[in-house]
Amino acid sequence: MKHTTIWFLLLAGILLGCRSIRPISNSSYVNPSRNTAYCGPQVSDPAIAYRGELNEFDVLGIARGQMTSESEIHRALDQAKQVKLHPGNSILLIQSGAAFPDAPMVAALSKHFQIVPFSGVPFVSSAESRPDYGSGNSESFAKSLRLAAARGGNDFIVCYWGFLESANEDLPTKTVSWMPMPGLKWVLPDEKQHMRIRLKLAIVDVRSGNWTVFSPEQFEDTRKSTSPRRGAKDQILVEELKKRAYEAGARDLVQLHSDIASTQ
């Protein structure tokens, strides 16, 4: 019942225009009433600035608009093998949209595998505002990525995407939280924020190109905040949800897509 109420509020937020969706690689707080962002350390180098997300089709080598025959489908099905990692395998780890994978994800996967962090920032052509992956061919990009991983001695590529959904609920104290008190101002929590995170991971076998995609459990939480600390509270909640989702993603990868559990 509690979860139903929370996500009913999210639905209401959609209708009222106060719901927001942010990628995990660009998760700074934006004040919905002022359209201003609360940021942590400022990004001064354009090389690591957020430029959008990697396309799942490009990472997996799925060619859009290409003619495919039934025989090709049957042959691919016959040759397909389950993607299975082994203890100590080397992983080229990519967080879509980020120059570096987040530290909690690296830490979670490093317990069982060798992790090589790799950029997930798509190249943006100077002539266009959209990401440009080189040739514009998904299969070509995927093979280039596999070649880069192979040259680095990596057995697998793991790329992950994530989004944070949030909705704000005004508390009854909203109208009085701005009233000054002797020596204090805005001391009453006046807003409740509901947030959840969704994560998706793709595993690509560097040698064969076989791949699998899965999503771990979704996590959600709710926090109250005051106006002066809204941005800071938001970022604390973001980092906590990220950590929980990363740990769940790493756990599912080990349990569902590796033989580590059977060797322990």
PLM region spans:
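Short acidic, gly/pro-rich beta-turn/loop elements at beta-sheet edges
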Residues: A103, D170, W211
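N-terminal segment of the mature soluble domain
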Residues: Q82-A167
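Bacterial N-terminal signal peptides that target proteins for export
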Residues: M1-W7
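Surface-exposed short loop/turn segments
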Residues: S135-V206
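C-terminal/domain-edge helix-coil "capping" segments
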Residues: I24-A80, L164, L188-R198, V204-Q264
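Bacterial signal peptide processing site
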Residues: R19-R22
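C-terminal motif of bacterial Sec signal peptides marking the signal peptidase cleavage site
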Residues: I14-G17
